[in-house]
């Protein structure tokens, strides 16, 4: 009832050639967005299996306003609640209303993922056995999550709860090399020399 997932993807690829196909490019980029809503599915199922089926989803009476109008077995408020106008709360050690378990919890997560890669290959004019090749790739991922528990819930009655998490990470990798390949009769020679470097970073907070 309160879980879903939405996703959007797109990508592009371009591979042009120049100078009589001696200079070749290959560019690829991808983007993905995802949005999810999570629920306390296990808690809801467990309570649904043990809930008295003769009880209504919503309660009748003034006291049920302290639990959002849902039917719950009630008890007097705890000593931690000093508000004189708040008199009742959901009883502990008893089955909770499974609909209230779902409706009183909201967790929304969003993520963005962007990646790209560019490759360049140059075949030397007049000396086509020698190739110069370079490539660079990068990826960036950003994720956020908001968690809200209603003040009418069993777990956080009166006080409620709000939590926030945000994390992002990125990586960059690059390489460049020269390659010489030639066949001498029945013999092949292939020589390559180059360098490669990468960088990774991650940050998160709540």
Set out the residue ranges of the language-model regions:
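Surface-exposed interaction regions that form or flank ligand-binding interfaces
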Residues: 130
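Surface-exposed loop/interface segments of Gram-negative outer-membrane beta-barrel transport/assembly proteins
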Residues: 15-115, 133-206
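Transmembrane beta-barrel architecture of outer membranes
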Residues: 5-11
